């Protein structure tokens, strides 16, 4: 019985670590409370060489999004990062290095990752951001401590496109549209031609279904003004 209970507890903790929607360790924002048809487009892991195409499309459709950027990639593509800001999109912190070992880092190392990314954002973009998205959506007590120490708002999602895992564009598109509802926060990545092609079709869908969009900045501002 003890072994069973321990196993169940361990499974729950592991599941809670990898499913940001459960809010097991961190009370992340995963959806906007709203009665109207509006959603948020969020892009992780940029800026990259693909980001300008995404920006061109968003500009053409007059849509604002939120980009959760990696510090070292901001350093690699400073002009692209500055363009994201100049075109009115929201910015979030996605750590400096997006380490594959994120779930195993100490709280002090996580604080360092977040603060170093903040420094790059400030230096190159001349802005500050209160938003943070955990790499891979992984949360645990150390990450929770780091978020509290750095005074960030953790932003998750309720529609995960799996665009870095699924190769078929149609399957990604169907996965998003099937799970979409009022206030959804969609997780995408501005890192491939594949996701760009999905975005083209997704924006047409949003237009047909009369969805508007919101950014993390506009969501927080509207909440503060309620």
What are these regions (language model features)?
Residues 13-102, 113-116, 120-123, 127-129, ...:
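Active-site beta->alpha N-cap acidic-glycine motif
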Residues 43-45, 69-71, 93-95, 134-136, ...:
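A cross-domain feature marking catalytic cores of carbohydrate-active enzymes
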Residues 46-49, 69-77, 101-108, 133-139, ...:
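Acidic-and-aromatic substrate-binding clefts and catalytic sites of carbohydrate-active enzymes
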Residues 54, 205-208, 226:
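Catalytic-site microenvironment of enzymes
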Residues 56-59, 63-68, 89-90, 107-138, ...:
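CE4/NodB-like, metal-dependent polysaccharide N-deacetylase domain
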Residues 138-140, 144-179, 211-223:
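His/Asp/Glu-enriched short active-site or ligand-binding loop at hydrolase and phosphoryl-transfer sites
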Residues 180-219:
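Catalytic grooves of carbohydrate-active enzymes
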């Amino acid at each position: 019985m003890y072994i069973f209970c321990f196993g169940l507890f361990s499974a729950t903790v592991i599941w809670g670590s990898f499913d940001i929607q459960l809010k097991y360790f961190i009370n992340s924002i995963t959806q906007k409370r709203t009665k109207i048809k509006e959603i948020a487009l969020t892009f992780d892991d940029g800026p990259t060489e693909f980001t300008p195409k995404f920006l061109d499309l968003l500009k053409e459709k007059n849509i604002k999004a939120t980009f959760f950027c990696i510090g070292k990639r901001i350093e690699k593509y400073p002009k692209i990062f500055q363009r994201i800001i100049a075109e009115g999109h929201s910015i979030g912190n996605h750590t400096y290095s997006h380490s594959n070992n994120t779930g195993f880092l100490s709280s002090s190392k996580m604080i360092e990752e977040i603060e170093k990314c903040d420094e790059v954002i400030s230096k190159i973009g001349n802005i500050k951001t209160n938003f943070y998205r955990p790499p891979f959506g992984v949360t645990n007590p150390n990450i929770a401590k780091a978020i509290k120490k750095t005074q960030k708002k953790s932003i998750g999602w309720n529609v995960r496109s799996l665009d870095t895992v699924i190769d078929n564009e149609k399957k990604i598109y169907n996965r998003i549209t099937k799970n979409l509802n009022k206030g959804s926060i969609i997780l995408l990545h501005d890192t491939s031609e594949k996701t760009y092609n999905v975005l083209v079709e997704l924006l047409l869908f949003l237009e047909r279904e009369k969805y508007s969009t919101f950014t993390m900045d506009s969501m927080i501002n509207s909440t503060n003004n309620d």
